[in-house]
């Protein structure tokens, strides 16, 4: 029969049976490590609101390794980030694609980071339409509105002209960390984090 090893730290009181994500949350670190869907959005929104209520002035760190996902779910996360009174630092690790890119760039200006080998993908919002001809027309109209708004916000986040955002989003556009820095998705490339929370 196997057994669980319980290793405790005298300074932190941390043991291997603790939930990693709960431990990170206690340090004001939240993690988007999957496709963006309603369940993930509800969890992240709740975590942001909780941390903002606990301390309205201390930063929240959002780490992103995501292929993207639902536009409505992603916009719920974005609106909650804007609602929070504290700064939200964003970190790209692995892949920040589509809605992952959007949330990365939506972080507090000056506090958006990429790890050296992170990859960032920008493209047009994707959305399928079904139903009757009238329903399809309504959905297509709404999708056009959302697409225009996301182009506008990405232009605001990056400082790029909206015309360039539209042109570069026409097809999948991948960025290295250095290219993402130059484009304006992030403000820093980091290689090391210190115990006190500072980054290099």
UniProtKB/Swiss-Prot annotation:
Stored CDD domains: S14_ClpP_2
GO molecular function annotation: ATP-dependent peptidase activity; ATPase binding; serine-type endopeptidase activity
Location (main, coarse): cytoplasm
Catalytic activity: Hydrolysis of proteins to small peptides in the presence of ATP and magnesium. alpha-casein is the usual test substrate. In the absence of ATP, only oligopeptides shorter than five residues are hydrolyzed (such as succinyl-Leu-Tyr-|-NHMec, and Leu-Tyr-Leu-|-Tyr-Trp, in which cleavage of the -Tyr-|-Leu- and -Tyr-|-Trp bonds also occurs)
GO biological process, one term: protein quality control for misfolded or incompletely synthesized proteins
Active site: 98 (nucleophile), 123
Alphabetical keyword list: Cytoplasm, Hydrolase, Protease, Serine protease
Any Pfam family the entry gives: CLP_protease
Superkingdom, natural source: Bacteria
GO cellular component: cytoplasm; endopeptidase Clp complex
Enzyme class: hydrolase
E.C. designation(s): 3.4.21.92
InterPro entries xref list: ClpP (IPR001907), ClpP/crotonase-like_dom_sf (IPR029045), ClpP/TepA (IPR023562), ClpP_His_AS (IPR033135)
Subcellular location, record wording: Cytoplasm
Entry keyword annotation includes Calcium: no
Membrane-traversing stretches: none
Chain's role: Cleaves peptides in various proteins in a process that requires ATP hydrolysis. Has a chymotrypsin-like activity. Plays a major role in the degradation of misfolded proteins.
Subunit (UniProt): Fourteen ClpP subunits assemble into 2 heptameric rings which stack back to back to give a disk-like structure with a central cavity, resembling the structure of eukaryotic proteasomes.
Family assignment from sequence similarity: Belongs to the peptidase S14 family.
Protein name, UniProt field: ATP-dependent Clp protease proteolytic subunit 1
Organism: Mycobacterium leprae (strain TN)
